[in-house]
């Protein structure tokens, strides 16, 4: 290794007029000097560059693996959320169906209860009307009977004398007597 560096140092001290050598002026470098520099960089920097690239590759692969794991976790969480959503939607549908059927049942119960109440009120109304009709008929009968009785009393008072009255009483007593004999 010492020989290689010595030869480079020796080449750097050659006279520059008409001879071959390294140009140490950075701004005036030529293609050969650049290729030698690149060769040295590649030879010595290859390991460092490979290590840097391997480290970068490992970081990228680790990032990809982490991203994949996060993606799989997110997919699993999404599936769990979808399953919960389906379950909740199913329960909501069940509650909705049960709610609608409960509402319909309550509606029918209310309609039936109202119908029964109206039927009872109709029956009470009919009974009240019938009672009032009977009461009115009885009042009319009583009034007609009273008027007829008063008319009969007036007629009897005007038509009956004491003698006629006594004969009617005796005739009625006689009829009751004969009826009593027949029944005995």
Swiss-Prot record:
Transmembrane segments: 27-49
Disulfide bridge positions per record: none
Lineage: superkingdom: Eukaryota
Record membrane topology: Single-pass membrane protein
Localization annotation: Plastid, Chloroplast thylakoid membrane
Record GO terms (molecular function): proton-transporting ATP synthase activity, rotational mechanism
Keywords noted in UniProt: ATP synthesis, CF(0), Chloroplast, Hydrogen ion transport, Ion transport, Membrane, Plastid, Thylakoid, Transmembrane, Transmembrane helix, Transport
Pfam families named among the record's database cross-references: ATP-synt_B (PF00430)
Gene Ontology cellular component annotations, sorted alphabetically: chloroplast thylakoid membrane; proton-transporting ATP synthase complex
Oligomeric and partner information: F-type ATPases have 2 components, F(1) - the catalytic core - and F(0) - the membrane proton channel. F(1) has five subunits: alpha(3), beta(3), gamma(1), delta(1), epsilon(1). F(0) has four main subunits: a(1), b(1), b'(1) and c(10-14). The alpha and beta chains form an alternating ring which encloses part of the gamma chain. F(1) is attached to F(0) by a central stalk formed by the gamma and epsilon chains, while a peripheral stalk is formed by the delta, b and b' chains.
Note from the entry: In plastids the F-type ATPase is also known as CF(1)CF(0).
Similarity remark: Belongs to the ATPase B chain family.
Main function: F(1)F(0) ATP synthase produces ATP from ADP in the presence of a proton or sodium gradient. F-type ATPases consist of two structural domains, F(1) containing the extramembraneous catalytic core and F(0) containing the membrane proton channel, linked together by a central stalk and a peripheral stalk. During catalysis, ATP synthesis in the catalytic domain of F(1) is coupled via a rotary mechanism of the central stalk subunits to proton translocation. Component of the F(0) channel, it forms part of the peripheral stalk, linking F(1) to F(0).
Entry protein name: ATP synthase subunit b, chloroplastic
Protein's organism: Aethionema cordifolium (Lebanon stonecress)
The gene coding this protein: atpF
């Amino acid at each position: 290794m010492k020989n290689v560096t010595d030869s480079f140092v020796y080449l750097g001290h050659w006279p520059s007029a008409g001879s071959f050598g390294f140009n140490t002026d950075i701004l005036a470098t030529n293609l050969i000097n650049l290729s030698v520099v690149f060769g040295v960089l590649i030879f010595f920097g290859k390991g460092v560059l490979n290590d840097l690239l391997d480290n970068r590759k490992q970081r990228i692969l680790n990032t990809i693996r982490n991203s994949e794991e996060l993606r799989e976790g997110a997919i699993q969480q999404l599936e769990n959320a979808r399953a919960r959503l389906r379950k909740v939607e199913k329960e909501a549908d069940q509650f909705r169906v049960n709610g609608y059927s409960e509402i319909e049942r309550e509606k029918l119960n209310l309609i039936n209860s109202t119908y029964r109440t109206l039927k009872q009120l109709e029956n009470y109304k009919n009974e009240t009307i019938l009672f009032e009709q009977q009461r009115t008929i009885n009042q009319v009968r009583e009034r007609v009977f009273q008027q007829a009785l008063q008319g009969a009393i007036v007629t009897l008072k005007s038509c009956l004398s004491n003698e006629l009255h006594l004969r009617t009483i005796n005739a009625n007593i006689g009829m009751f007597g004969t009826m009593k004999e027949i029944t005995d």
